[in-house]
Amino acid sequence: MKVNIDNKIKLHGFNNLTKTLSFNMYDICYAKSAEDREAYISYIDEQYNADRLTEILTNVTEIIGANILNIAKQDYDPQGASVTILVCENPIEEERKEALVKETPGPLPEIVLAHLDKSHITVHTYPEYHPDEGICTFRADIDVSTCGMISPLRALNYLVHSFEADIMTMDYRVRGFTRDITGRKLFIDHKINSIQNYIPSNIKTKYNMIDVNVYQENIFHTKCRLKQFDLDNYLFGYTKKDLYPKERKKITHKLKKEMDEIFYGKNFDEVYYK
């Protein structure tokens, strides 16, 4: 259903639709020794500590034009962090309303617009490593849940830029219903056919993307994987010049196998690569 400013839908009471964006990013690297793996985990833990994550979520809140009611943040031992922000709505300025219903990438934090009520933003981090293979991964799980007119997809552009991930999985769903003035139920209040429409072209050219959408259920799923692979970008503490060719090939295989398994959500046997 298309909503536009010139032909507004008249609602009965408040817009009761709940819109939720789940954004998961993965960073993958290879650390040669146990000490290197521990150093990577410590580096990631510091890079994405509770204070840094709070800064990112605060910028998300500004982008969608909300007021912060409460912030709860926590760093964990031995690693990981989480932040939860409760937010409430800001009034929408008339000249900004048109931007709220467009199926286009959202702004970066310099531009502030949106509308929220009874909503929350959360992030949790999950650093880990393989006990034997030298592979280390970091996952950040961000949920932006809103009630009202604006879609949390407006924050997606900024989140993509904030993490520059190797792999991303994004889920968007709309739940509940609101009513027009005749009492007719509305189960979605904006046009959408893909989450990809909210990702800028310069980002889309860098990733291979797959959509799995269930339109009749208002469920949209997109996963992305970097096209370009440069081994130097995945080595922690040294470069490929420090490795023998045979070792480079072995590490490249391990990294690509790890990325395949994360992207497709299943384990692959070695025979798959022969």
Swiss-Prot record:
Keywords: Autocatalytic cleavage, Decarboxylase, Lyase, Polyamine biosynthesis, Pyruvate, S-adenosyl-L-methionine, Schiff base, Spermidine biosynthesis, Zymogen. It is an enzyme of class 4 (lyase). One of its GO terms (cellular component) is cytosol. Pathway: Amine and polyamine biosynthesis; S-adenosylmethioninamine biosynthesis; S-adenosylmethioninamine from S-adenosyl-L-methionine: step 1/1. GO terms for biological process: spermidine biosynthetic process. InterPro entries: AdoMetDC_fam_prok (IPR003826), S-AdoMet_deCO2ase_bac (IPR009165), S-AdoMet_deCO2ase_core (IPR016067). HAMAP family: AdoMetDC_2 (MF_00465). Heterooctamer of four alpha and four beta chains arranged as a tetramer of alpha/beta heterodimers. This is S-adenosylmethionine decarboxylase proenzyme. It comes from Clostridium acetobutylicum (strain ATCC 824 / DSM 792 / JCM 1419 / IAM 19013 / LMG 5710 / NBRC 13948 / NRRL B-527 / VKM B-1787 / 2291 / W). The gene is speD.
